[in-house]
Amino acid sequence: MGGKLYKKLMIFICMVPVLISCNKVSDSNISNKDIISYCTGDIDSDGTYELIAVNDGGERKKLPTKEAYGKFVEIYKEFTIDDGKIILGSEPDYSFDFSNMKPSKVQLGDVDGDGKLDISIVMYKKVKFHNALAKRPFFYNFKYGKLVPLWLGSRLSRPFDDFKLADIDNDKVSEIISIEELEDKNRVLAVYKWNGFGFDLFIQSHEEFKKLMFDSTVTEIKLIADGKEREVKFIDGKILIE
């Protein structure tokens, strides 16, 4: 393949830290130690960043997967970042009680392509069409001081360990990049695109792994696969893990 064509087809999967910053609290420093996951971004399109967070209310509880989960989803309009430390206002501007859904992770991305950030919250609950406790990828918009559901899907194609939002194909729309469990307990990387009503499986990796996780030390989509650091590339409609 010629070098010029290769450059057009090869895309490193990456986040956009200028627009969005998301962290687990173990990876950062934040003034409220009850917060277990947070993102900063302009969720109401007013030209200024907000911080949206999952707060555990000081209870320090964990899911069967050993992941911490919270009770409240909070939005702060006032916060400062000083030498890497995030200092929040004394009280959130908005607080939503999701204690019956056990939220564990919040992310931001424009999944439906309307130019506005959507809010992704991982919940742990039963749903109508899947009567078992499992992690669910719920999506919301923030409008008029409320979290308005965009998509409360029952599940992805398979149970997932974790997922991130990123634009893998440079179409200015965020895709779901998911680490999923197969029937034989191996893991694969799967990508989903918004179809107007929900998410369709777009592509998945051919390679399978016994253990697969995101490298939390970088903003790019990099993996730890069976103990080795691996890069993810999107080439000519395929995912390669190198």
Predicted segments, located by residue:
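Sec-dependent signal peptide recognition
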Residues: Y6-I13
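Short, Lys/Arg-enriched N-terminal segments with co-localized hydrophobic residues
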Residues: M1-K4
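Beta-propeller-forming repeat regions
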Residues: C22-E242
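Hydrophobic h-region of N-terminal signal peptides that target proteins for export
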Residues: C14-S21
